């Protein structure tokens, strides 16, 4: 009976703690939908999360900040999960690359995971020394594995112990191979994501993503096309915008970072030109529909 009473008291205390005004030391279990009273907090520091937006007909309006401009529904808005334990608040996004951020609930720091995700270095630096070191570790690991295999019958260990040893070795090999791959240069045949495509790919991208900044050389407000010499010189303006390009096997994609992030997917072998800038300018948002 005492145990039951004790459990009831604990449940009541938990309910009281969860109802405390935010921020506080109360716990918030991992959830996709934080309490309504906490939305302003979360949407200030995790502004890309889906629970901060109302989307309709492909156009999204911020739930908390009325003055926030309308945006087009795209990859900028991600499914998020948030939690709070003690004085630590955290959120992570279910994007292609998961982003996890922990911050102090009382002194939080803004973290724009989307900008970091899109900021890929123009030129990847190949860490030759790291690759050499990793290769030596791989050779040593393989030699150790061969030695263990030869001594397998002499080992006086249980089958489960042997299995764990081999699993550990294979895991180590996997980590070493991943380290090598991450330090290798990007190949034009491999999946990539970058702000500046390789020079040999410029003609392709500048044919179909002709408004992207990597296609132009600008000086004193005048811009000249890098690829097509017969293209007339144009004035530097909103026509030229920052872009991110990516290729995943047979699918090519570029995203223009305009006021509204605009994304276009196409077949790499049979691409289709899209005048995204003209379409974007013609895009009329009826706020009454939101």
Swiss-Prot record:
Keywords: Glycoprotein, Host membrane, Membrane, Transmembrane, Transmembrane helix. It is found in: Host membrane. InterPro entries: ASFV_fam_110 (IPR004848). One of its GO terms (cellular component) is host cell membrane. It comes from the Viruses. The keyword DNA-binding does not apply. It is a multi-pass membrane protein. Glycans are attached at residues 242, 267. The chain crosses the membrane at residues 1-19, 128-148, 163-183. Belongs to the asfivirus MGF 110 family. Plays a role in virus cell tropism, and may be required for efficient virus replication in macrophages. This is Protein MGF 110-9L. It comes from African swine fever virus (isolate Pig/Kenya/KEN-50/1950) (ASFV).
